[in-house]
Amino acid sequence: MRNKVRKIHMIGIGGSGMSGIAEVLLNLGYEVSGSDLSMSQTVRRLGSLGASIAIGHGRENLGDADVVVKSTAVTSDNPEVVVARERGIPVIPRAEMLAELMRLRTGIAVAGTHGKTTTTSLLATIFTEAGYDPTVIIGGRLNAYGAGARLGQGEYLIAEADESDGSFLCLSPIASVVTNVDADHLDHYDGIEAIDDAFVDFLNNIPFYGVNVVCLDDPGVARILPRVNRPILTYGFSDKARLRGRIIDSGAMSCFEVSLDGKRLGEMRLNHPGRHNVLNALGAIGVSLEVGIPLGTIAEALAKFAGVGRRFERKGEKDGVVVVDDYGHHPAEIKATLATARAVYPERRLVVAFQPHRFSRTKALFGDFCTCFEAADELLLTEIYPASEAPIPGVSGESLGQGIRQVTKTKVAYYPDFAAMEAALPGILRPGDLFVTLGAGSIWQVGAHYLESERGA
């Protein structure tokens, strides 16, 4: 019956969770069409691979699709969803399509509020180094592939599992990684208890012969572990973790020692900075050891790791100012990114441009956002990236700036749009600065435009 489906339409095809699935489907020989609100490099890439993509959503985009896949951000009143249901065409979430792809392979899924993309990418790098030729689907651009997906011929499918709407429960992996369990996506979940319940169900969804590799350092993970009835391998810096890391040296590269059940395994070098990325590496090491990949192969892969797009990505330097871009948009991610910035560039003044992501997240975590920028010398705020959400009265980039000023000494400036922020940059940035653009929306454009502008302008 699977052969009856040949034409697949994807609404929001350019999104981080959708584009990788689309690329794998194209490589498998399916006819893929889709729509997205705007043109992007990702949309252009998918078009070059054979996808037929419309810019904007409309009833006419659907064509004669056999199934419609929608991203988390797409609502039930989307015209393409409406016409599909009128015609009796199945409309499924992206996780259900990912689950179908996973049925064809041995699945490994990486979940967690933060660190999913990097951990998934590290696993992909290790499995590729080991000659396993995995299929990989991530929510970012793995620099080694130049894309967020890769169709391999091997046994394993390694994928990022999206907890944002609970649809990661569609997946049936043989092994999982959970990096952390934190308060986020409160537009979908009623509270932290509901988030805990979803992660417990996810961990208990693996078979009895599988394994869950989980970060014991995270309080949320530690909180739910007593409710998990499947095999567990804990990792972290804690002396209670079975797979334990100890940082030896940190900087542009991270050097750390690894031990398992008290036995020293050796030293690793990760071609990526940050304490949080050592934790991500430990999660990937845990799964790799469970599969049977030799320690030497793991070490070689970590040393070669080329990184992930928009994860503390050095974009360039102009007039003595180093520009780094990062996807971080949750307070915990922001703190980790700024700590990394301080560790890698300790002598530089830290100027941060932040675009909040979603009105619901900004409202729910307002207090945490007010205190997470304390490591910055200067903070430039712009308006909230809505991600299809309607505005919430009293919640804005400007109100966030007011809140930050009340509780920290960080210098804060608010700009209603990118144009205003970019116009102010020449008077703010000076030689020796580190300029970090932060956010899940389009704030990266500010750094890109600064680097592209005339030198010294």
UniProtKB/Swiss-Prot annotation:
Coiled coil regions, renumbered to chain: none
Keyword Cell cycle: yes
Main location: cytoplasm
Top-level division of the source organism's lineage: Bacteria
Pathway: Cell wall biogenesis; peptidoglycan biosynthesis
Enzyme Commission number: 6.3.2.8
Pfam families attached to this UniProt entry: Mur_ligase, Mur_ligase_C, Mur_ligase_M
GO molecular function: ATP binding; UDP-N-acetylmuramate-L-alanine ligase activity
Listed SUPFAM superfamilies: MurCD N-terminal domain, MurD-like peptide ligases, catalytic domain, MurD-like peptide ligases, peptide-binding domain
Nucleus is among the record's keywords: no
GO biological process, one term: cell wall organization
Positions annotated to bind ATP: 112-118
PANTHER family the record matches: UDP-N-ACETYLMURAMATE--L-ALANINE LIGASE, UDP-N-ACETYLMURAMATE--L-ALANINE LIGASE-RELATED
Task of the protein: Cell wall formation.
Similarity remark: Belongs to the MurCDEF family.
Protein name: UDP-N-acetylmuramate--L-alanine ligase
Organism expressing this protein natively: Solidesulfovibrio magneticus (strain ATCC 700980 / DSM 13731 / RS-1) (Desulfovibrio magneticus)
Encoding gene, per UniProt annotation: murC
